């Protein structure tokens, strides 16, 4: 699967009224969990990004703290998740939850850099399609309890954080799939650099669920 390039989500505001305690609790619960339209923004202290290609069939919801959920059925191409803006080159990212794809989907640490423009993935889990299919393996790195295979692919005249562009994608694909754990990003970025895959100035960095004409559900918390 060539990557489904992504980004973007929106924020909703909720006004409160003086009411009985039960009503106040309900208001807080609604405020903490928001089903949103495609866009980018901040929610409960975390940056979020949600994008889809307009096919529908996807419900992305921001929850409390670093939690988000996605439910999709007969969807097109989408990606959504929570993290940081900007990201860093040495962050240890924790994630936990459930990930239940049926078809073509990824769960990954996902982000971009500028100058050079790079889209990158540290793939922790995936559905029926291995994203390394058809790509040339450049190396491998052992980190966080598994070997990851390293690849580089290119996208030509595709959507990006600066509009339509041609850019490289860097990949680390975990051999032992998981839906919870910690990712030491520096281990991957250093291993990529040893293969000549350099990153520029960091843009956003999130834990993302991505899908491509598939179905499934996920509920992930990042920190």
Curated annotation (Swiss-Prot):
Induction: Induced by D-xylose, dependent on the cellulase and xylanase regulator xyr1. Repressed by glucose through negative regulation by the crabon catabolite repressor cre1. It catalyses: Endohydrolysis of (1->4)-beta-D-xylosidic linkages in xylans. Residues 20-33 form a propeptide. It is an enzyme of class 3 (hydrolase). GO terms for cellular component: extracellular region. Pathway: Glycan degradation; xylan degradation. Glycans are attached at residues 71, 94. One of its GO terms (biological process) is xylan catabolic process. InterPro entries: ConA-like_dom_sf, GH11/12, GH11_AS_1, GH11_AS_2, GH11_dom, Glyco_hydro_11. Its EC number is 3.2.1.8. Optimum pH is 4.5-5.5. Stable from pH 3.0 to 8.5 at room temperature and from pH 4.0 to 7.5 at 40 degrees Celsius. It is found in: Secreted. Keywords: Carbohydrate metabolism, Glycoprotein, Glycosidase, Hydrolase, Polysaccharide degradation, Pyrrolidone carboxylic acid, Secreted, Signal, Xylan degradation. Residues 34-222 form the GH11 domain. The modification Pyrrolidone carboxylic acid is found at residue 34. One of its GO terms (molecular function) is endo-1,4-beta-xylanase activity. Glycoside hydrolase involved in the hydrolysis of xylan, a major plant cell wall hemicellulose made up of 1,4-beta-linked D-xylopyranose residues. Catalyzes the endohydrolysis of the main-chain 1,4-beta-glycosidic bonds connecting the xylose subunits yielding various xylooligosaccharides and xylose. The catalysis proceeds by a double-displacement reaction mechanism with a putative covalent glycosyl-enzyme intermediate, with retention of the anomeric configuration. Produces xylobiose and xylose as the main degradation products. PANTHER family: ENDO-1,4-BETA-XYLANASE, ENDO-1,4-BETA-XYLANASE A-RELATED. Belongs to the glycosyl hydrolase 11 (cellulase G) family. This is Endo-1,4-beta-xylanase 2. It comes from Hypocrea jecorina (strain ATCC 56765 / BCRC 32924 / NRRL 11460 / Rut C-30).
């Amino acid at each position: 699967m060539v990557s489904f390039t992504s980004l973007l989500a929106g924020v909703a505001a909720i006004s409160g009224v003086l009411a009985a305690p039960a009503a106040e609790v309900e208001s807080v619960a609604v405020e903490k969990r928001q089903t949103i339209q495609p866009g980018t923004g901040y929610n409960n202290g975390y940056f979020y990004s949600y994008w889809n290609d307009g096919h529908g069939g996807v419900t992305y919801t921001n929850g409390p703290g670093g939690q988000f959920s996605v439910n999709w059925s007969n969807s097109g191409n989408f990606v959504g998740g929570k993290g940081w803006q900007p990201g860093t080159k040495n962050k240890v990212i924790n994630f936990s939850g459930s990930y239940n794809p049926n078809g073509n989907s990824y769960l990954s640490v996902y982000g971009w850099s500028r100058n050079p423009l790079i889209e990158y993935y540290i793939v922790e889990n995936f559905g029926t399609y291995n994203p390394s299919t058809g790509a040339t393996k450049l190396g491998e790195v052992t980190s966080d309890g598994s070997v990851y295979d390293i690849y580089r692919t290119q996208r030509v005249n595709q959507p990006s954080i600066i509009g339509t562009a041609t850019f490289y994608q860097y990949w680390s694909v975990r051999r032992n799939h998981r839906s919870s754990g910690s990712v030491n990003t520096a281990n991957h970025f250093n291993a990529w650099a040893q293969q000549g895959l350099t990153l520029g100035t960091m843009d956003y960095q999130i834990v993302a669920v991505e899908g491509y004409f598939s179905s499934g559900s996920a509920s992930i918390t990042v920190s």
